[in-house]
Design a protein with these regions (language model features):
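Post-cleavage N-terminal segment of exported redox proteins
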Residues: 1-39, 145-150
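Sequence context of c-type cytochrome heme-c attachment sites
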Residues: 26-41, 90-94, 120-125
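Short microdomains enriched in Cys/His and/or Lys/Arg
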Residues: 38-42, 74-89
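Sequence/structural segment immediately N-terminal to covalent heme-attachment motifs in c-type
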Residues: 42-55, 77
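The canonical Cys-X-X-Cys-His
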Residues: 50-61, 117, 139
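Acidic helix-start/capping segments at beta-turn-to-alpha-helix junctions
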Residues: 64-78
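Electron-transfer interface patches adjacent to heme c in soluble/periplasmic c-type cytochromes
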Residues: 80-110, 127-136
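C-terminal capping alpha-helices of c-type cytochrome domains
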Residues: 114-116, 123, 127-150
Length: 150
């Protein structure tokens, strides 16, 4: 019984201790001129859906949830955001070549069609981020139009 108490105390001290390890924040006060929304004159309804469903992980400005202040959850989110931005950063859209843009648009279309994005782990907590069938069609049609006009 004594060993269990010691292990519990060590675990509690460790958990409290890791709360003081900072994480990198993905927040910016400005929207760059190279942003996907600005460059492509995206309709307002699609802008809103992309903001809610995509931009937290695929831009330079994440709207952090309350649970981001708890370790080790914050580390998981930080890694997830870094991976998302490495794959696609909407804020850097205009810096991509036409060929790369077409590739990214094909990928976006495919992932929305297959229900791969937004991730289930994200929509589990952020219900508003999930695409309805109508929203998915609208976004896919817009992305297809963009790709065809490159």
């Amino acid at each position: 019984m004594k060993i269990v108490k010691i292990i519990a105390i060590i675990a509690l001290v460790g958990f409290v201790g890791i709360q003081f390890i900072p994480t990198e924040r993905n927040q910016s006060d400005t929207v760059p001129e190279s942003d996907f929304m600005l460059v492509n004159n995206v309709p307002e309804t699609i802008q809103k859906k992309l903001q809610v469903s995509c931009y937290d992980c695929h831009s330079n400005n994440t709207q952090y949830p309350w649970y981001n202040k708890i370790q080790p959850v914050a580390w998981f989110l930080e890694d997830h955001i870094k991976e998302g931005k490495a794959e696609l950063n909407f804020n850097e859209w205009d810096s991509l070549s036409s060929r790369r843009k077409a590739s990214k648009l094909r990928s976006i279309i495919k992932q929305i069609e297959n229900g791969e994005m937004p991730l289930d782990s994200y929509t589990l907590i952020h219900k508003e981020a999930a695409f309805s069938e109508e929203e998915a069609k609208e976004v896919i049609n817009f992305m297809t139009q963009l790709k065809d006009n490159l």
